[in-house]
């Protein structure tokens, strides 16, 4: 009989049974079939193959993105095991991801999701799932509407990320837990709950929880909902379309390995390729290949794009800074929303969000500092289940701590460096190259970053993080 584990609602979830047949993709054709029994199907990183176990409990070992697994509905309890970041397809029950720094995301069914000895981000998504960290400092993600889950091995270094449940303080967490024998149940909302196996309330720590943004302590100080684009013109307008130090023709950041030139629409020789457009309250920044005529004006760079700053119009010390945007998913593009010191110095720098177009499941949140006398950076590469479409990206900057948010849910924290206590202004841009690499297709169809709004808030004087 197959091994089982009870989930948070008392339903037994099954592990795949022991295999009775074994198959390898090495030397196979494009399709590899199993038997009607329990199969182990081994991929090969050099073989482009779809493996089909068929009936029975099948276990698939995937070694690269060209190894694929397929199961029809009702064909046993099936498991995928891989070192890669992976989202479980339909008709699979269980997933193991062993690679450190990877994510393991479930599907809409009741899943058993397991990590490895390193650090993983584990999100069962829909269904009532059983989650197993299996060592390392893991992040467990729970979003409202995705059911009730159980963590079998929550430890001191693990993190729980709660999205949409309205918890804004650790005290609220403690007031909603109840001991059930050896287990601790956290009551969430709408009948959903999270169970910590073999845990008591006094073992929970505030640092283990990433909670929702408390908007009641915020007072709006800046807002642009982009019904029009208010470019600076003398002493009026909001946005500069170039760095404060750049000439009228614009510039780029060559030290970042960027392959685009940021076009200043007010510079006549390149005004024909204005990267900014506004439609229905959404600002679009477009990156595109540069024609030979334009290249002659922009130092030979291959691409054009746009950047905006509030250097001339707005800066603030501490507060909450937020952008709602639809990020591009094209290979080789690098969208960002960030803060720089109003006095023109660098570092420090506070990156609210950066992304690589080809990696839409990773939100990069970074703080740069010179507090030690040399440049240091704390980078958080946060795994999210779905960053397609519009989402909010924010950072809460206080005297003691910096907290990053994705859709109002905290995703990362860092201490505020000693050189980050002066006013900073906002920047938003769409770069090409740099950390995202070279576009695979030369951006033949262009790439678009769409921004619904950018806002800033101050904090109530008596509020503490």
UniProtKB/Swiss-Prot annotation:
Hemolysin-type calcium-binding repeats: 33-50, 105-122, 123-140
The protein, known as: Endo-1,3-1,4-beta-glycanase ExsH
Places the protein is found: Secreted
Function according to Swiss-Prot or TrEMBL: Cleaves high molecular weight succinoglycan to yield LMW succinoglycan. Dynamically regulates the molecular weight distribution of succinoglycan by cleaving nascent succinoglycan only during a limited period after its synthesis, perhaps before it undergoes a time-dependent change in its conformation or aggregation state.
Primary localization class, coarse: secreted
UniProt pathway: Glycan metabolism; exopolysaccharide biosynthesis
GO molecular function terms attached to this record: calcium ion binding; hydrolase activity, hydrolyzing O-glycosyl compounds
Entry keyword Secreted: yes
Family: Belongs to the glycosyl hydrolase 16 family.
GO cellular component: extracellular region
Domain GH16: start-end pairs: 206-462
UniProt xrefs under SUPFAM superfamilies: beta-Roll, Concanavalin A-like lectins/glucanases
Organism: Rhizobium meliloti (strain 1021) (Ensifer meliloti)
Active site: 349 (nucleophile), 354 (proton donor)
């Amino acid at each position: 009989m197959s091994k089982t584990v009870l989930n948070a609602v008392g339903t037994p979830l099954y592990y795949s049974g022991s295999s009775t047949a074994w198959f390898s993709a090495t030397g196979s054709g494009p399709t590899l079939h199993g038997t009607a029994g329990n199969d182990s199907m081994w991929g090969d990183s050099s073989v482009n193959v779809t493996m089909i176990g068929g009936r029975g409990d099948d276990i698939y070992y995937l070694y690269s993105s060209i190894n694929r697994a397929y199961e029809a509905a009702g064909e046993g309890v099936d498991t995928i095991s891989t070192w890669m970041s992976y989202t479980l397809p339909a008709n699979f029950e269980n997933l193991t991801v062993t690679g450190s720094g990877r994510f393991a995301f479930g599907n809409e069914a009741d899943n058993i999701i397991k990590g490895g000895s390193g650090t993983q981000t584990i999100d069962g998504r829909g269904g009532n799932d059983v989650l197993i960290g299996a060592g390392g400092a893991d992040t467990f993600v729970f979003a409202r509407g995705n059911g009730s889950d159980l963590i079998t091995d929550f430890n001191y270094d693990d993190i729980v990320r709660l999205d949409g449940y309205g918890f804004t303080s650790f005290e609220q967490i403690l007031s909603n837990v109840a001991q059930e024998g050896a287990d601790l149940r956290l009551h969430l909302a709408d009948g959903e709950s999270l169970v910590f196996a073999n845990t008591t309330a006094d073992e929970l720590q505030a640092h283990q929880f990433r909670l929702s943004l408390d908007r009641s302590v915020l007072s709006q100080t800046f807002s642009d909902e982009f019904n029009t684009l208010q470019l600076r013109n003398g002493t009026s307008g909001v946005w500069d379309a170039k760095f404060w130090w750049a000439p009228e023709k614009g510039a780029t950041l060559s030290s970042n390995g960027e392959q685009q030139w940021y076009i200043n629409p007010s510079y006549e020789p390149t005004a024909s390729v204005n990267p900014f457009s506004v439609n229905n309250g959404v600002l679009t920044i477009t990156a595109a290949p540069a024609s030979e005529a334009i290249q002659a004006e922009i130092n030979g760079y291959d691409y054009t794009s746009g950047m905006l700053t509030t250097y001339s119009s707005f800066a603030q010390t501490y507060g909450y800074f937020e952008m709602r945007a639809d990020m591009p998913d094209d290979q080789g593009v690098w969208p960002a929303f960030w803060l720089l010191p109003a006095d023109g110095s660098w570092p420090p720098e506070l990156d609210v969000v950066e992304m690589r177009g080809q990696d839409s499941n990773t939100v990069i949140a970074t703080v740069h500092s010179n507090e030690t006398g040399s440049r240091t950076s704390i980078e958080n590469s946060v795994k999210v289940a779905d960053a397609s479409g519009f989402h909010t990206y924010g950072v809460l900057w206080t005297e003691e701590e910096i907290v990053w948010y994705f859709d109002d849910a905290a995703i990362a924290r860092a201490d505020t460096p000693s050189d980050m206590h002066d006013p900073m202004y906002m920047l938003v841009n769409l770069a090409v190259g740099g950390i995202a690499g070279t576009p695979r297709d030369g951006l033949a169809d262009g790439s678009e970053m769409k921004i619904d709004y950018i806002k800033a808030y101050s904090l109530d004087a008596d509020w503490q993080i």
